[in-house]
Amino acid sequence: MPRLFGTDGVRGLANGETITADLALRLAQAAAHVLGQDARDPRVSGEFIAAAVAAGLASSGVDVFDAGVIPTPATAYLIADFDADFGVMISASHNPAPDNGIKFFAAGGRKLADELEDRIEAQLSRPVLLPTGADVGRIRRFADAEDRYVLHLLGTLQHRLDGIHVVLDCAHGAAAGISPEVFTDAGARVTVIGNDPDGMNINDRVGSTHLDLLAEAVLAHGADVGIAHDGDADRCLAVDHTGAIIDGDQIMAVLALSMARRGLLAERTLVATVMSNLGLRIAMAENDITVMQTRVGDRYVLEAMNEGGYSLGGEQSGHLVIAEHATTGDGILTGIQLLGEMAATGKSLHELASVMTVYPQVMINVRGVDRDRVGDDAELNAAVARAEAELGDTGRILMRASGTEPMIRVMVEAADQATAERHAEELAALVTERLAI
């Protein structure tokens, strides 16, 4: 039977096979047993799932403080600030509105270790002894949750954002009520799009996975910069004043150099995943900064940061963790820190991001193959070695097995698009030929 927990909690189609009211209630009861706050994004299904989670927790003797619609990183922050035992976020992040998910945070606002998730999952199949009468938990509204989080974010800024015109794309998500307030209070001139959540339009052609609208708005309004969040606001991607997309790797490069300059980049090390662009490693090496690479997934970035005591890490997708101020990826925090660097240096985002050259990257998903044999086929390994020799220091190849389906991802970076495409297509064809099921 496949593991219930994925890389970011339990996720699936709301009221489908996985994310049901019954599962939410039982999962909450199991979590109460193992771990012993409740928040969500604006998806319409979040209402019944949050109610079921709250009921499951309270019926297990846990006092629940319902923070309502807030970003995932706000939940993590409030767990620590409120000294809660644990917390729950109802969200499917950047997924479309029909999906939803349940993710748990431990005390201090940190993501659960695999071992704790496994214990919760195992508890689902065991009988649960529930309290009765006066021993059940209470469900209360966390009235000042949003205000606490806003004050925390504003307190992280070293420079006000006066004079910077920013377009915010809130993805019709959890950032809608908070991000514009934070940027405005910090002094920026704010234009907002994707800020009318109705429960069904979250991430719908807006947000960090659909940047065309943001780029158009930045150009139309003559803004200095655009910032895009995803549905639960744990991501941040940007657009410069020319309409060019600035991805998570480029944002990490800007913030790493800023933190290194101020003596805040622990061990002069940045934590990134194997999917981060070769240009990031080259730019950091030129500035005497080490890039530590992890598996894909912000949880693995967090684990490496916690183990090594590092202060900055993230993913190309826009999950960035700034350890001084957050225990998880925080899109609003990342955005204001990025604009803070613009304010501190007087440089445009275009200038700041130019520290890194983005190498063309081509990804091909090869389906219907034996993912367990990646790396074991001699002919395929020889082809990869030949391609790597041709690319030299100006490219790289990564083959990655999917964790959920019979698929292998072939990724090639090169100095030019045509070379990257040629090698990716040749290797993908060979993967199909050699590893077909």
From Swiss-Prot:
InterPro entries: A-D-PHexomutase_a/b/a-I, A-D-PHexomutase_a/b/a-I/II/III, A-D-PHexomutase_a/b/a-II, A-D-PHexomutase_a/b/a-III, A-D-PHexomutase_C, A-D-PHexomutase_C_sf, A-D-PHexomutase_CS, Alpha-D-phosphohexomutase_SF. Activated by phosphorylation. Gene3D superfamilies: Alpha-D-Glucose-1,6-Bisphosphate, subunit A, domain 3, Alpha-D-phosphohexomutase, C-terminal domain. Catalyzes the conversion of glucosamine-6-phosphate to glucosamine-1-phosphate. It catalyses: alpha-D-glucosamine 1-phosphate = D-glucosamine 6-phosphate. One of its GO terms (biological process) is carbohydrate metabolic process. The modification Phosphoserine is found at residue 93. The active site is at 93 (phosphoserine intermediate). It comes from the Bacteria. The keyword Translocase does not apply. Belongs to the phosphohexose mutase family. Its EC number is 5.4.2.10. This is Phosphoglucosamine mutase. The gene is glmM. Keywords: Isomerase, Magnesium, Metal-binding, Phosphoprotein. Its cofactor is Mg(2+). Mg(2+) binds at residues 93, 230, 232, 234. The lineage of its organism: Bacteria, Bacillati, Actinomycetota, Actinomycetes, Micrococcales. One of its GO terms (molecular function) is phosphomannomutase activity. One of its GO terms (cellular component) is cytosol. Pfam families: PGM_PMM_I, PGM_PMM_II, PGM_PMM_III, PGM_PMM_IV.
